[in-house]
Amino acid sequence: MDEGGGMARRAGRALVLLGAVLLLARNVLWYAQTELPALQEVLADVLQRGPEGALSGEVGRLKTYELLGDVLIDAYLLCATVLAPLLLRGGGERALGPLAAHLLGFSLPIIRRVALTRTRGLLMALGVAALLAGAALLAGRRPRGGSVPARYGRAAGDVATLGLAFLSGVYLYTACCVVANEFYAPGMAVVAGQMGHAVDRAWVALRLAHFVAASALSLLVGVERPGSGWEAGRGRVALRAVGCAALAVLMLRGIAEHYRYYILLPRLQQVTICLCALCLVGEALERVGSRLDGEASRAAPEGEAG
């Protein structure tokens, strides 16, 4: 490895660790400033009035479910943040790109909601930016060898991989909003009635299950897409992409039709379908390219022998 490449890798590893530290600092700050006081208030209400009494009023229910939603979101962010240095240590640097894209998709709505002038919003933005920069430095340059279909197939697969990882983060935040708004908060029933539908908790639970499956599949596409020699994935990626597309479209179409005020979901659905189609095209091009490269490598010794 040349000196420039070694410096880039060291800088990339440092940026990944810095991003993880910043995101952990944001989690600790948010817990100390928001969740701990809310937890103390809810526990005091439960001790004073009992669980049924504390949850009997509208305000009590909303406080409890708000706290539950915040804890779930922060727990997920904590797990994803800890995963970054673990991948770095375990040699899974190739998976850092999809992980950073996934965290970007999840955190963008939070960063927009929490202004960058606030410390926790700034820490999250800087942490995600450092992770992205570190993952880009560690990825380095792709090998330029091989036939034209193989090169274009690798490029299409990379774009689809990062796009699906990003959208899986958006799906996660959307699902958290759907569950928090429709499943827990009683006040949303009034809004739902005004929009011409009733809150269907079984439906929300089913959409959440669709989301979990779609996110898992899209992350698998990102983590396991390339082989050790950048060869084609022999259909595994294409199969996962099709499954991811089917589940994501089911979830997004159902939510968009049932809850009209999630206006962004139809557009996300279209982008998801396009990315999964791009993933399939990239897989096909890589297979064609690997076949052409194999034929060319076999023909070269025969030409030399002749």
Can you say where each PLM-predicted feature lies in the sequence?
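Short, Lys/Arg-rich, polar N-terminal cytosolic tail immediately upstream
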Residues: 1-7
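Alpha-helical transmembrane segments and immediately adjacent membrane-interfacial amphipathic helices
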Residues: 9-38, 63-143, 153-189, 193-227, ...
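Long, glycine/tryptophan/cysteine-rich extracytoplasmic
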Residues: 39-63, 197
